[in-house]
Amino acid sequence: IFGVNTFAHRFPHLLFALISVYSVYKLARHLSDKTTAKLAALMLATSQAFVLAITDARMETPLSAGIIFGLWQMILYIDNKKAINLFLAALGTAVAFSTKGWLGPVIIFLTVFFYILLNRKWEIFSLFKTWMFIPVFFLLISPVLYAYYIQFDLHPEKVIRGKSGHSGIRFILWGQLFERAGGFDVKERHSSYFFLYHTFLWSFFPWSVFAYTAL
């Protein structure tokens, strides 16, 4: 639409960033008061890593949008039991999956589980439409699975990291999360055990001190 240029490359990431900030505000407003919602949106929008992801057009921008939007809609569904919120939750979760595999959906599912646990809303699982989330989710990610299939499964001759015979389906459904979590692709890096702690200092700057104080 906009041609091949920097604006066309970064504009979608700006839209995803706006979705993230708006979803954070709406979710916080649903769970708390207006002041808290404004502060939550402000902290996300001005954090160092979030701004960097937009300017560099990184995959973390649509990942964040999918997670936050999907979580917001899932919480709304649990509280209001409206089918439209369930569908939008599946859409957000599918967007998150499309970026980095199961990482996004796992974050959403774990958060929702503890929300249900703390609020004792187990009755949501007795509704038939709740379970419709599963087929809708897989329907929405089917284009992504197909894209990985035609790029890799149909071309086993492709050499990646010195190896051929890669399966795109296996990568997005398994390797993207589980192999990375197990460190199978970073065995030689010997990362510090405190990596996430000191990385959070700059990534959530200037709010990292407040976050650590809250912990």
Provide a role label for each language-model segment.
Residues 52, 85-100:
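Membrane-interface alpha helices of multi-pass inner-membrane proteins
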